[in-house]
Structure formats: structure tokens, C-alpha cells
A protein has these predicted regions:
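Short boundary/loop segments of OB/S1/cold-shock single-stranded nucleic-acid-binding domains
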Residues: 1-22, 74
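Helix-rich effector regions associated with P-loop NTPase G domains
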Residues: 17-20, 32, 47, 57-77, ...
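Conserved hydrophobic positions within beta-strands
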Residues: 24-26, 83
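A short macromolecule-binding patch
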Residues: 43-53
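Short, Lys/Arg- and Gly-enriched loop/turn segments at beta-strand edges
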Residues: 78-86, 124-126
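Conserved beta-strand/loop subsegment of P-loop NTPase cores
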Residues: 110-118, 141-151, 171-178
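Canonical P-loop GTPase G-domain recognition
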Residues: 153-206
Length: 332
């Protein structure tokens, strides 16, 4: 089959109109405009655009440029600036807007780590959401930390907190209970963030903006109350933005999301992104075991013996069924 000819990217006016080429890092993305911190200046940030036909080879997303990207841009005599190239990414976090959507967006790129902020009360973060985020981080080689916020609301339910903490720490994840209200865990959070570029993600209403305000005094990001009717937050962050931390490093704030659709996974790969399932699968009788019904499946045996949590296995099945709708069922 003949290959389609590739159109030449025309990401800016003609080179003759441009008076300088610069490089920098994208620190803010609103979807239609990007702010770039220039390498060759004392903290100068300039607004840039990309042309509508700008695309990265091999990746089709709603945002061709993501916060954290290293970019090349042309600045023109009229003051406008256009991004002309994006350097190869070390890694990134990508998601589908919803389970029904085929469009994907990159939350951030070139990360040293990511933190999922979850809450066990007001609102409750679903374990499926947690597991989908962690699986995506595994898939794209981004070390993940689980931050459990609003621990001050769990004074009468610390057993739940300890159970969730034990579950994810036993798998191998770092879990940090924090409270922006009491200050619990904030010093540990600073230790993990120092000198690193870290994405912060989570459902709306889990307190991401409040935590960032505590970590960066004077920033004053907008926060919002939780709906008493639906126990959900409202979106106060509407675009991704990168902030320098006063103790060194960068933190990337992203809009709160209600769902986390995975992308670019095959059914055979999904188990690789659940560390405890992947470890158990070494003992399966068949190399192509789906861990759903096959005889001699070591994963199903581990599930039966409570060495794999039912909630984690359910999350594994949910991703399988998202890829191949309705094919996989929990064992009876």
C-alpha cells in the first residue's frame, strides 16, 4: 500500500518575516495559546500560537503542544510568535476525555513524576479512577505517587485511610496522607516535589488548588466549595499551568477531571500496568492468558487467595472492556 505523502508543516509566517529563533519550555496551555519560558532570557515568558495544521508525528491529540514540552519558536517583527517544533518527549501523561470519547489530550510532558490527589470523603474518589491513572502512569514510564487529601475529615474513619494506604503501598506505590487544613503531610510532600517536575492531577473538588496554594505562598489559585447535592467539585482550574516551587522544582496544575479514559493499550498490555497482576502472571500456564477464565491462571488464583485486591482486579477488567467492549467478565 502506497504511503500517503506528508504535508509540510507551515507553523508560522515565512522565515523572512521572522527576526529571531528561540527555544524554551511551554509553561501554560489554554488550548488556543501557549506561554513559553524562554531559555535565553531572565525569566521572560511570551505568548505563542501554532497553526491549525501543526501535528506531531505518530501522535494525534487535541493539543499538539503540552505543558512541559521543549519547543522551538519564531518571533516575528510584529511581536507575534509561533511554535515551529516540539523536541522529542521523555515521557507524558495522556487521557481520553471520557470513556466514550475517541479524542485524547496530553496532560503534561517531560515529567520526573506525577501525583494523583484523591479523597476518601467529600468527595469520594473512585478506586477505578485511581487505578486507571496509575496504569496510565505505568504505561508511559512516569513514577506515580498517591496523595490522599482531606485526612482531617477522616478522624472517625482512620481505618479506611489505613486500608487504602496499605493496599497501594503493598503494590509498591508511595502513599502520602495530607491535609491542607491541618498541615499533615505537607513536609513530606515538599520532600517528594523538591527539584523535580511533577504533574498534579485528580477529580474536581479534591483540593489540588488548595494544596498548591499551601506549597507556593502568595500564588492564590482560585478554589471552590463542594456541591452538597452531588458531592462533587466544580472546575476552578480550566487550563494546564506550570509553577516554580520556592524550594526548587516545578509543579503542573491541571483541570480537575471526572473520568480517566485510557488510550493506546492493547488487551495483552493491560496486565503489564498493574504491577501485582504482572508479577503473578509469571506463573500462568498460558503465555497469552487474559487472566479472566483460563485454566491454570495464577492471577485468578492470587485473586481467590486475596493476594490481589478485588477492586484492583475490577479496574483491570474495566480497562479490558473499554478496549474490547463487553468481552471480559469477572469469574463467577
Amino acid at each position: 500500500m502506497a504511503k500517503k505523502s506528508k504535508k509540510k508543516i507551515n507553523a508560522s509566517p515565512s522565515a523572512a518575516d521572522a527576526y529571531v529563533t528561540s527555544t524554551g519550555m511551554c509553561v501554560r496551555s489554554t488550548g488556543s495559546q501557549y506561554d513559553v519560558l524562554l531559555d535565553d532570557s531572565a525569566g521572560e515568558v511570551i505568548p505563542c500560537k501554532v497553526k491549525g495544521n501543526f501535528r506531531l508525528k505518530g501522535i494525534r491529540t487535541t493539543n499538539p503542544v503540552a505543558v512541559g514540552d521543549r519547543v522551538t519558536l519564531l518571533r516575528n517583527a510584529d511581536g507575534s510568535a509561533y511554535i515551529t517544533a516540539v523536541a522529542p518527549r521523555r515521557n507524558y501523561i495522556i487521557r481520553r476525555a471520557s470513556n466514550l470519547s475517541k479524542e485524547a489530550s496530553i496532560l503534561a510532558a517531560n515529567l520526573d513524576g506525577c501525583m494523583l490527589v484523591a479523597t476518601l470523603k467529600h468527595p469520594v474518589t473512585a478506586t477505578t479512577f485511581i487505578d486507571r491513572f496509575l496504569a496510565t502512569a505505568e504505561a508511559y514510564s512516569v513514577p506515580a505517587t498517591l496523595v490522599i487529601n482531606k485526612t482531617d475529615l477522616l478522624d472517625n474513619d482512620r481505618e479506611l485511610l489505613e486500608a487504602v494506604r496499605y493496599l497501594y503501598e503493598s503494590i509498591g506505590y508511595t502513599v502520602v496522607p495530607v491535609s491542607a487544613h491541618t498541615g499533615e503531610g505537607l513536609d513530606r510532600l515538599r520532600e517528594l516535589l523538591q527539584g523535580r517536575t511533577t504533574l498534579l492531577s485528580g477529580n474536581s473538588g479534591v483540593g489540588k488548588s488548595t494544596l498548591i496554594n499551601d506549597l507556593i505562598p502568595g500564588l492564590d489559585l482560585r478554589t471552590a466549595a463542594i456541591s452538597d447535592v452531588h458531592d462533587q467539585g466544580t472546575h476552578t482550574t480550566t487550563f494546564s499551568e506550570m509553577f516554580p516551587l520556592p524550594f526548587g522544582g516545578w509543579i503542573i496544575d491541571t483541570p480537575g477531571v471526572r473520568g480517566f479514559g485510557t488510550i493506546e493499550m492493547t488487551p495483552q498490555e493491560v496486565s503489564h500496568y498493574f504491577p501485582e497482576i504482572f508479577r503473578a502472571s509469571d506463573e500462568c500456564r498460558f503465555g497469552d492468558c487474559s487472566h479472566t477464565h483460563e485454566p491454570g491462571c495464577a492471577v485468578l488464583k492470587a485473586l481467590e487467595e486475596n493476594r490481589i485486591a478485588q477492586s484492583r482486579y475490577n479496574s483491570y477488567l474495566s480497562i479490558l472492556n473499554e478496549i474490547d467492549e463487553g468481552k471480559y467478565r469477572a469469574p463467577q
